[in-house]
Amino acid sequence: MRVSEPSDVVIRSDDTCHIHLTWSGSERRSAAKQHARKVAMKLGVSSGLIYLVGQPTVNWGDSDQPQPFRQRRYFYYLSGIDEPDCYLTYDIQADLLTLYVPDFDLRRAVWMGPTLTIEEAHKQSDVDRVNFFAALQHDLEWWTTKNKGTRPIYVLHDSQQPLIPSKRLWLDNERLLPAMNAARVIKDEYELRMIRQANYISGLAHRKILEDIHRMSTEAEIESSFLATCVSHGAKNQSYAIIAGSGENAAVLHYVKNNEPLDGRQLVCLDAGAEWRCYASDVTRTIPLWTDWPSERARNIYRVVEEMQEECIRRIRKGVRFRDLQLLAHDIAIKGLQKLDILTNDCTSAIYESGASAVFFPHGLGHHVGLEVHDVSKRPITALDGNQANWGNHNFVPLLTDSSWSVPLLDEGMVVTIEPGIYFNRLALLNAQNQPLAKYINFDEAEKYIPIGGVRIEDDILVTAKGYENLTTAPKGEEMLEIIRRGIDNS
């Protein structure tokens, strides 16, 4: 269905579906002012000036062609403006949020169309004032002179500080970034509407591929279909590069070449999510390239990953340690692989501590989602260094801290992914044979699964006051198989 207005599609933990096809004009405006106040609260100050620089127009090296524009996400959080060459200030004491847009340029307007006007900016954002860039320098000097260096100007980085000819300038480049990270990790209603819409469009694109997969012959066709559906529904940008890995490519976590044929392969791992007004979705589905599971091995691995995801999602609620869900996912993976004779029947904790399960499940269970697909937070969600396995350690043992106090808890308003996976990567298995953990792996049996590649299932989950809400609408499991069958029957 082609929609002319954004839609809210919500799949809640009780499996009910709610669809709203219209928004009021006020709902289209960003929540920039609310975000600015939230950041000031996280800073813990009552005065000072926040100064942010938007993404400038930049050409490719040795070229007159501009690089694709992508707004700086911290700037968007406080402005709601997705246009280049803008600036922003927030006077904390005066509670005054001011946006500066590019000056009118007739030549540019003739060639490229006019830049953002003051009136248009007010329609898009709830900032207090909008001025042209020409006023920025004067306003900054006026504020600095007025405060005589007694109040700081907060900037994200040294490279983004204002050029003010003053010897009494007080710049703080340390406190703003962590304050904004702490603010961004909890999403408000405006942000949730954006993330729901991104998921809704992603769901349409995933569904379209399921309907047509029997006609497709290459990974590139899958990618192009996903892009076409997203763009036709107003989502021109993707949250990240599309991953459409078939066969052994499904075992490469960030495979983005998407240039090989599907013929003779069992599964395709499709990791693709649309972006809506700078907010991300992150969705993965593993699709059989047959009317049903192409092999018992493929079905069995899918079922293990399905259980990993369902059990972890079921336990999401405020106050839960995400680290514990990561451990639960590994426990389910180990027991599932033991039943398939891929791992030995030793103690699950010994297998986990050896790193043997990480040969098959080498990444974190999930991450925050928001303005970035791997969104910011005050601390890593699993207390992992970088929220990943230690890739410098060839044993692939995840660095999970044992210090309970340092592990962050899930909180209401967080949006996190639950994305377990099991992979049979030829290089990872070859490397594991030379490690102490090899005693826990039946390599002869594991190698039989290499043609499957890997299985990953990923949804975006909102932590609510009473539990969770699944924001992802893309079909999976039996619903996915039924859509594939109907597509063949209707062709």
UniProtKB/Swiss-Prot annotation:
<keyword id="KW-0464">Manganese</keyword>
<comment type="similarity">
    <text>Belongs to the peptidase M24B family.</text>
</comment>
<feature type="binding site">
    <location>
        <position position="282"/>
    </location>
    <ligand>
        <name>Mn(2+) 1</name>
    </ligand>
</feature>
<keyword id="KW-0482">Metalloprotease</keyword>
<feature type="binding site">
    <location>
        <position position="271"/>
    </location>
    <ligand>
        <name>Mn(2+) 2</name>
    </ligand>
</feature>
<keyword id="KW-0031">Aminopeptidase</keyword>
<feature type="binding site">
    <location>
        <position position="419"/>
    </location>
    <ligand>
        <name>Mn(2+) 1</name>
    </ligand>
</feature>
<comment type="function">
    <text>Catalyzes the removal of a penultimate prolyl residue from the N-termini of peptides.</text>
</comment>
<keyword id="KW-0378">Hydrolase</keyword>
<dbReference type="GO" id="GO:0070006">
    <property type="term" value="F:metalloaminopeptidase activity"/>
</dbReference>
<dbReference type="InterPro" id="IPR007865">
    <property type="entry name" value="Aminopep_P_N"/>
</dbReference>
<feature type="binding site">
    <location>
        <position position="458"/>
    </location>
    <ligand>
        <name>Mn(2+) 2</name>
    </ligand>
</feature>
<dbReference type="GO" id="GO:0030145">
    <property type="term" value="F:manganese ion binding"/>
</dbReference>
<dbReference type="GO" id="GO:0006508">
    <property type="term" value="P:proteolysis"/>
</dbReference>
<dbReference type="Pfam" id="PF00557">
    <property type="entry name" value="Peptidase_M24"/>
</dbReference>
<feature type="binding site">
    <location>
        <position position="458"/>
    </location>
    <ligand>
        <name>Mn(2+) 1</name>
    </ligand>
</feature>
<dbReference type="InterPro" id="IPR036005">
    <property type="entry name" value="Creatinase/aminopeptidase-like"/>
</dbReference>
<keyword id="KW-0645">Protease</keyword>
<dbReference type="InterPro" id="IPR029149">
    <property type="entry name" value="Creatin/AminoP/Spt16_N"/>
</dbReference>
<keyword id="KW-0479">Metal-binding</keyword>
<dbReference type="InterPro" id="IPR000994">
    <property type="entry name" value="Pept_M24"/>
</dbReference>
<protein>
    <recommendedName>
        <fullName>Probable Xaa-Pro aminopeptidase AFLA_084750</fullName>
        <ecNumber>3.4.11.9</ecNumber>
    </recommendedName>
</protein>
<dbReference type="InterPro" id="IPR001131">
    <property type="entry name" value="Peptidase_M24B_aminopep-P_CS"/>
</dbReference>
<dbReference type="Pfam" id="PF05195">
    <property type="entry name" value="AMP_N"/>
</dbReference>
<dbReference type="InterPro" id="IPR052433">
    <property type="entry name" value="X-Pro_dipept-like"/>
</dbReference>
<feature type="binding site">
    <location>
        <position position="282"/>
    </location>
    <ligand>
        <name>Mn(2+) 2</name>
    </ligand>
</feature>
